[in-house]
């Protein structure tokens, strides 16, 4: 099954934070911070602004940083994804 986002939406595969600290301490699930990085796996077709179609800036394969509590969490085939609006993406990691 695939996710095909609509409009200005983007599907991001969440990159989980490290489970072990630099000092070797293993973090329980409740102590880990909510992830804010991911890889773009699908993008929508863009949105219309003042009657003109505006393409999205992000593309498949981009590694991005997004707002901490943005988007809708989706679990598909055992993988975690976020369905975000492009405006929820703060930066592309180059």
From Swiss-Prot:
Keywords: Chaperone, Cytoplasm. PROSITE patterns: CHAPERONINS_CPN10. It comes from the Bacteria. Its main location: cytoplasm. InterPro entries: Chaperonin_GroES, Chaperonin_GroES_sf, Chaprnonin_Cpn10_CS, GroES-like_sf. GO terms for molecular function: ATP binding; metal ion binding; protein folding chaperone; protein-folding chaperone binding; unfolded protein binding. GO terms for biological process: chaperone cofactor-dependent protein refolding. NCBIfam families: PRK00364.1-2 (NF001527), PRK00364.2-2 (NF001531), PRK00364.2-4 (NF001533), PRK00364.2-5 (NF001534). Heptamer of 7 subunits arranged in a ring. Interacts with the chaperonin GroEL. Belongs to the GroES chaperonin family. PANTHER family: 10 KDA HEAT SHOCK PROTEIN, CO-CHAPERONIN GROES. This is Co-chaperonin GroES. The lineage of its organism: Bacteria, Bacillati, Bacillota, Clostridia, Thermoanaerobacterales. The gene is groES.
